[in-house]
């Protein structure tokens, strides 16, 4: 398993083991609310981003009533405060660029929490545009190789034929990167050929990765973990080359 895949697997497992399911549901609900509002529809058949958010929520056993409540909030049918999507930028130890996607109903609270987390963990919050140029918007499709009958080489060719820009294969997963606007078409092409898709989402992918020394890399990973643990933070992206060896050292 690649370092990035292993890192997110560990984070998901730790979330369950630490009884953070409530926090997970909050983040999933915010994804659904933002997707509903941005897509202008509460119908997943008409709103692809919402469909992906609902599929991810159901994969994590989120109750249907929670999903509907989040959709209603996005449609303005709720008494809850409106959410806004905000991006934060900064640097971690070793010059690691960090891009944060947040969803909040209180910008001042989130600003304060993000800045404090950077400052307490060896990082530096940055101005808008300070690191975002190092990332590009992509679609990401993840396939669990243990759940498919096709071999990795065949899957790679299928993905490229469907329009993928890049395919990363390791022992357990196959990650397909594509233009975000092509995500639905490529996902559907794979499903039509009998390939189960474990996850599909819009991401910000670093254009290049860096490898600071181990001390700085571990410190950067600690900062990323702290940022991911903030209630208002949905996703954290970085240009850190998260190797399997680094994750093993971090988890030791």
Curated annotation (Swiss-Prot):
The entry's keywords:
Cytoplasm, DNA-binding, Transcription, Transcription regulation
Region annotation Disordered: residue ranges?
1-22
Q: Where is the composition biased (Basic residues)?
A: 1-14
| Keyword Cytoplasm attributed | yes
Record localization: Cytoplasm
The record's Gene Ontology cellular component field reads: cytosol
Single GO MF annotation: DNA binding
Keyword hit for Transcription:
yes
Q: Name one GO biological process term.
A: regulation of DNA-templated transcription
One Pfam family name is: TACO1_YebC_N
Per the record, the similarity remark reads:
Belongs to the TACO1 family.
Q: What is this protein called?
A: Probable transcriptional regulatory protein Caur_1043
């Amino acid at each position: 398993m690649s370092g990035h895949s292993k890192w997110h697997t560990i984070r998901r497992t730790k979330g369950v083991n630490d009884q953070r399911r409530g926090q997970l549901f909050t983040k999933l609900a915010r994804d659904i609310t933002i997707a509903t509002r941005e897509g202008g529809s509460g119908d997943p058949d008409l709103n692809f981003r919402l469909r992906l958010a609902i599929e991810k929520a159901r994969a994590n056993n989120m109750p249907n009533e929670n999903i509907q409540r989040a959709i209603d909030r996005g449609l303005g049918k709720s008494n809850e405060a409106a959410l806004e999507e905000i991006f934060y930028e900064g640097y971690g130890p070793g010059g690691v660029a960090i891009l944060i996607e947040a969803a909040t109903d209180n910008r001042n609270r989130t600003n304060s929490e993000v800045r404090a987390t950077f400052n307490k963990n060896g990082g530096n919050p940055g101005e808008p545009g300070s690191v975002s140029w190092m990332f590009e918007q992509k679609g990401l499709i993840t396939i669990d190789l243990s759940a498919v009958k096709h071999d990795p080489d065949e899957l790679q060719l299928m993905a490229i034929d469907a329009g993928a820009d890049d395919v990363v294969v390791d022992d357990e997963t196959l990650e397909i990167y594509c233009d975000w606007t092509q995500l639905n078409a490529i996902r559907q092409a794979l499903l039509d050929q009998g390939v189960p898709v474990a996850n599909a989402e819009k991401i910000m992918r670093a254009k290049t990765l860096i490898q600071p020394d181990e001390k700085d890399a571990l410190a950067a990973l600690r900062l990323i973990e702290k940022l991911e643990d903030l209630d208002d933070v949905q996703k954290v992206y970085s240009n850190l080359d998260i190797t399997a060896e680094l994750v093993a050292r971090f988890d030791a």
